Regions:
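Active-site-proximal segment of zinc-dependent metalloprotease catalytic domains
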Residues: 96-334, 338, 342-360, 431-432, ...
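Non-catalytic C-terminal accessory/binding modules of secreted extracellular proteins
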Residues: 143-144, 150, 160-174, 181, ...
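Acidic, divalent-cation-chelating loop motifs in proteins
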Residues: 235-239, 668-678, 701-707
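Alpha-helical segments with a strong preference for the paired helices of cellulosomal dockerin domains
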Residues: 247-250, 673-696, 705-725
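Extracellular glycan-recognition surfaces and repeat-rich motifs
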Residues: 513, 523-557
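Short beta-strands within extracellular/lumenal beta-sheet-rich domains
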Residues: 555-581, 589-594, 626-628
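Extracellular carbohydrate recognition and processing domains
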Residues: 604-635
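Extracellular carbohydrate recognition
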Residues: 646-663
Length: 725
């Protein structure tokens, strides 16, 4: 069920804008560096430092935008690179917001049209045969005279090395492999696709008629008609359901997915042919890309990255970049160059797209990650050669972590770095996967790379240990292994080390937690103090334990009532707290503000706690209640303090269900040297290797004589024999 959710969406999907900057020439001869953002439904250009620009249709200059009727239009000031700006230009930009984007409602309306009902994903990989149609426009032929041979080799040839340029002195343009090579490698031989390449055919449309993807249906239908005499489309209904399994269109010329290009050009995407039948079969899913990489005048043949990205949509895999840009609350931090379904398709001018990740292999059915649930030392080998990853389930249903090793070799040669990547995969919301919104909300990414150093841009410090030498991750680190809802996982990872062969070893600890809840239902009140279930509470400034009144006044019969300036303070805690939460109920007609603190042992000052969203001062509107969650580790012996900072002076708010989650010590098993929870022959082997000096271990001195030697091996064998009897 989970796998079906991860790959079973239906929509029109596209490659993200190429992240490479482009230098354009203004009409006066000056140059301007541009960056493109978004996809075929939502895109805009900025200067290198983030000021949005558009091309003025009247004079051809790129100018800083102005907002007119919720539309971005060319303003009056010609754009320049930062070092070339005049004082007047700098003054105008001082009050200009960076990364101004198209109106979110307009983008949402366009996206609503994408919810189509086509066939996606799960082919019989052994019976697959795809169709690729080369399509020229009436004003744009292919650059190579023999385009068919060029692209047939690029798509189908085994162990493809590249092609010879058509320059006066031809040279090899090297590629890492063909489309076939890419999928054969990413599936570990499970999928060896064959594509019939036909054409080029010419359609009676201009390259500028595409209008990104807005007029794609007309172009696609024209291409199907033009190729009809060359193809029996029924041959590509491999499952016999009356619908062609897929068609890929490769259009001549450039694409609007590169900065500085005409926005009327086609934007590569995947979608559904809405209503077309030929040769007795209907058409369903299609995908398309363009011939050229970058600026069309450069005539650089595009690599295979865009084809692999768009064809992956046909296999049912969603986009993993932020598909609505600044909508849904702003721009999200996405996998970037670490994923084919984000910016990884563009690596090395798309000639070396990064390989499928553990998630993408899982979603396509190429590999199932091994679940880990026992403590121990594990090794994960580079996914390019092993096709393997590990899975750790969180304490939230349908949410888990994936671990994989990436090495800068083969398809991963152009990744930003190498080491172990850790991904959080959250499939608790079916809609975001079904409608291609996986990473739209910056406050809740459903597919998140846990970057080792907590960065937000692609770097060699993202993997573990990486250049940041980050060797551990657990529930209390940044990043951490908690669920999105703050629930702690039952494991921690430490001693992460990478070997020269690209393998990464790590130690997995299984951590148990105990939850303590104060609900004030059975407490003893003695003046200003309350003996609770796990600590004593001090009530200050009119705080008291009171019967709840109404639906929004607590959970149960009793809670701690609070007025403005009331405080609830704990005694010193007998244990470390990893997660602290409580509910604050405001049944009054006034807005309340609540703050939460802790004080470490021996300290006099209180430290303000930030909740899971990074907020110290939490506003609770009248008639509402909130759950405040804190993941800061509170040391043993600390106190906590809840303060109603502002609020009603006469009508009370209520604090209830104060919850502390604390770790329970994991008692070591004597003789369990590899930490897998068992004492067996593998521990004997580990001890012998330690005595020989091949490895270092803890707990090897089993007889307590201060040395680790052969006598400890005898002790270990006796423990093993005793555990088996």
């Amino acid at each position: 069920m989970l796998l079906g959710l991860l790959c079973g969406y239906c929509s029109a999907d596209a490659v993200v804008a190429c992240p490479d900057p482009s230098v354009v020439t203004q009409p006066d001869g000056s140059t301007l560096t541009l960056l493109l953002h978004g996809d075929e439904w939502f895109s805009f250009s900025t200067t290198a430092d983030g000021f949005t620009v558009v091309k003025d249709a009247d004079d051809g200059y790129y100018k800083y935008v102005a907002l007119q009727n919720n539309e971005l239009v060319a303003g009056t000031i010609v754009a320049h690179d930062a070092t070339m700006r005049t004082p007047v230009e700098k003054a105008a930009l001082a009050t200009t917001t960076r990364y101004l984007a198209p109106d979110a409602k307009t983008v949402a309306a366009k996206r609503a049209k994408r919810r189509l009902h086509g066939n996606t994903g799960r082919y019989d990989y052994k019976n697959f045969r795809g169709l690729v149609i080369l399509v020229a426009y009436n004003d744009c032929p292919f650059v190579f005279d023999d385009a068919h041979t060029l692209f047939n080799d690029m798509i189908n040839q085994k162990d493809y090395k590249g092609f010879m340029s058509n320059a006066q002195f031809p040279e090899l343009i090297p590629y890492t492999g063909s489309v076939r090579d890419y999928f054969y490698s990413s599936s570990a031989g499970e999928f060896d696709p064959a594509f019939d390449v036909v054409g080029p055919v010419t359609i009676n449309y201009s390259q500028y008629d595409a209008r990104q993807a807005n007029n794609a249906q007309a172009l696609v239908e024209a291409a199907l008609d033009a190729a009809d005499s060359l193809v029996n489309y029924k041959d590509y209904d491999r499952d016999g359901d009356g619908t062609v399994d897929m068609v890929f269109f490769l259009f001549a010329g450039g694409g609007s997915n590169f900065s500085g290009n005409d926005s009327r050009l086609l934007w590569p995407h995947a979608s559904t042919v809405l209503s077309k039948s030929l040769d007795g079969v209907r058409f369903g899913r299609y995908a398309c890309s363009t011939e050229l990489y970058g600026r069309p005048q450069s005539k650089i043949i595009d690599g295979i990255g865009t084809i692999c990205h768009e064809f992956s949509h046909v296999l049912g895999i969603a986009d993993l970049y932020d598909t609505d840009g600044t909508g849904s609350g702003g721009s999200s931090v996405t996998p970037g160059k670490w994923s084919l379904m984000a910016q990884g398709s563009y690596l090395n001018q798309s000639r070396t797209p990064c390989t499928y990740s553990a998630y993408e292999r899982y979603a396509a059915g190429f590999s199932t990650p091994e679940k880990l649930n026992k403590k121990g030392t594990y090794i994960v080998n580079p996914i390019t050669s092993s096709n393997k990853g590990y899975r750790l389930d969180s304490n939230t249903d349908n949410e888990f972590f994936l671990l994989e090793s990436r090495k800068q070799e083969g398809w991963d040669a152009y990744l930003p770095g190498e080491g172990m990547l850790i991904w959080r995969v959250d499939s608790t919301n079916a809609d975001v996967w079904e409608y291609n919104k996986v990473n739209c909300n910056p406050k809740h990414s459903y597919y998140q790379l846990l970057r080792a150093t907590g960065g937000t841009t692609d770097s060699d410090a993202d993997p573990f240990p990486g250049t940041g030498n980050v060797t551990a991750i657990d529930n209390t680190t940044t990043p951490n292994l908690c669920s999105w809802n703050g629930r702690m996982s039952d494991f921690g990872i430490s001693e992460i080390a990478r070997s020269a062969d690209g393998s990464v070893s790590f130690k997995l600890a299984v951590q148990q937690y105990e939850t303590q809840v104060e609900d004030f239902e059975d407490v003893k009140v003695d003046g200003s103090t309350v003996k609770g279930k796990f600590t004593t509470w001090t009530l200050k400034n009119n705080a008291k334990i009171a019967a709840t009144a109404g639906e929004n006044a607590g959970n149960g019969q009793y809670a701690c009532s609070m007025l403005r300036s009331s405080e609830l303070v704990s005694d010193t805690l007998a244990w470390e707290v990893n997660v602290f939460s409580y509910r604050f109920f405001n049944p009054t007609s006034s807005t309340s503000i609540v703050r939460t603190y802790y004080r470490q042992p021996g300290a006099t000052a209180w430290t303000s706690l930030k909740d899971e969203t990074g907020v110290e001062t939490v506003t609770v509107r009248a008639g509402t209640n909130v759950k405040l969650l804190f993941t800061t580790v509170i040391p043993k012996g600390s106190e906590v303090r809840i303060l109603e900072y502002t609020g009603n002076r006469t009508a009370p708010c209520y604090v209830d269900d104060i919850t502390f989650v604390r770790p329970v010590e994991d008692k070591a098993i004597v003789g369990d040297l590899n930490g897998d929870g068992n004492v067996d022959v593998t521990d004997v082997t580990m001890l012998i290797n330690a005595i020989l000096g091949q490895i270092q271990i803890e707990g090897g001195d089993l007889n307590g004589d201060g040395n680790v030697d052969v006598t400890d091996v005898t002790s270990e064998i006796n423990i093993v024999l005793g555990s088996q009897n």
